[in-house]
Amino acid sequence: MKDKVFGEMQFNVGWCKMETISLWGNLYTFKIRISTTKDEVPSEKQQQAYLSFKKNLNEISEKSLGLVNDFLSNNIDEILGELGEPLPTNLTDLLIPNQVLLFKNGKTAIIFDAAWTDENVVIL
């Protein structure tokens, strides 16, 4: 499917495409995923949320880094219990961003792989 805002997308539990995005001064390959069924196309709210995400990426990068550091600080005992010491010098290596999820209502979430568990972490 080709969308006027997202471009070429494939269906895999929502319409998806891969995109390289700079976050926290690093380049990451993100899956951009639209919360839809196969019969639906991205909504105007999802298109606007994506455009806003791209436009405000520097602010999102700064804000999400603070949230990630807070999350890691609040969960340090669990992380140490799973990984032991020493922890990586760069604590953001413990949470690797891998997906931007755009909900039908226009909300956006960044999903991370967590180094100490098989579960994902979400920051809205």
Describe each region flagged by the PLM.
Residues 1-109:
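N-terminal domain-onset segments
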Residues 103, 115-117:
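A short catalytic or substrate-binding loop motif that flags glycine-/basic-rich loops and adjacent residues
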Residues 109-115:
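Short beta-strand segments that buttress and anchor functional surface loops
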Residues 117-123:
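Short, surface-exposed coil-to-beta transition loops
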